[in-house]
Amino acid sequence: VTPFRTARPAAATTVAVCAALATLTAAAPAPAAPQQGARPLPAVTPRAETAALYDDEQGGNANADDPAIWRNPDDPDRSLVIATAKEGGLRVYGLDARLVQSLPAPAAPGPDDAPGRFNNVDLVHGLRLAPDRTTNSAAGRTADLAVTTDRGHDRLRIHRIDPSRPGGPLTDVTDPAAPRVFSAGQDEVNEQATAYGLATWTDRRSGRSYALASRRNRTSIALLELLPTRSGTVTYRKVRTLDLPAAFRLPDGTAWTPCGDPGELPQVEGMVVDPADGTLFAGQEDVGIWRMPADLRGKPVLVDRVREYGVPGTYDEESEECAPGKDPGFGGTRVSADVEGLALLPERNGDRYLLASSQGDDTFAAYARRTGRENRAAPVYAGGFRVTAASATLDGSEACDGAAVLNEPLGSRYPGGLLVVQDGDATPAPEGREATGFKFVDLRKVRSALGLARAAEAAE
């Protein structure tokens, strides 16, 4: 992923957050002084890894990206990890990291069009579907769903989760008439400024379920309400959209836009909603982490910056890369571009921790959201960690994209919960092949590395 991006004006959407640049400076956190002699971050090791995926013709152009963890309430040992593989479709794994089901991405609609490309995935629990006509049941069924952004077609894809289903737990229940998320037509889809990042959210007040989708190479985020149809499928409607800024006023009074390929804006990918108060956290890859109401009605606040924030860059057409200039020192100290996967770790005492993948330096940062604090309070940095090799054949996570965490007992393998992280450079790999995959980490190791286990014991 290119570390710097250029900006050009985007089409207006329902909510715009591109007001006076000076306002952005006030909303962003003050630059932190570099830490001298800081201790190395603690390391945790994975317990298991999935088989490598290969982004080439032989491997079906499969490229690991984003995971989600589904807990089987009847048999936690049979819980599942559902993960995107881009043009390779969806993969479903057991807790042993072995493949349970593989679903292909949809084919290209025409010879000159892009095929389906599953980018990000998240879960919805207990959505009520229409009555099942195949069984003549009059009662509506509730179902857990895996919702995916299909970047290739600019649509959401929705799969029902049923662990007892012969042939695999996932069934596609996407309404064939489901609309495109951002694009007006196929020509616009082919430009690939399409649905990209994803987070799901069920409003506790109304009971309605939503997906929030970001737009590739743009700053837009769309709120989409998930709607069951009479035929038992699921569609969605766009409620509103919001545009994050693409240009920023720095503390020295100068303006800055992240450098990137011509015509591209600084995009968002990693997103997660805290269901306790309906707060959306969104990672603008080359900028930092934003906080905003998940209904997209309020003003976004930049709560942490990437280290590269404010660094000027010049795009080189020959190399197709950005050459960075002198660092003015306005960036943060916790995450390096790209800021990628975001996940929420809830504790038993009600505290919540936002985990962020710092792709630029192969680390993960944790931010505390304390019980009883106002929603407007910024998350507080609580530590970080690395996922490193457990052995010569079980490597760690590098250039991590997506991540998912579940702090609930998952049977005998993960009684203290599970963290799943993407590995952007799975090794060992055959020479000349790009290998990716997912690492499964015992959550107790992560909580110990962050000091959460000791804090929980002290509170008891």
Predicted regions and their residues:
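Secretory targeting and sorting signals
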Residues: 1-33
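Sequence/structural signature of beta-propeller domains
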Residues: 4, 33-460
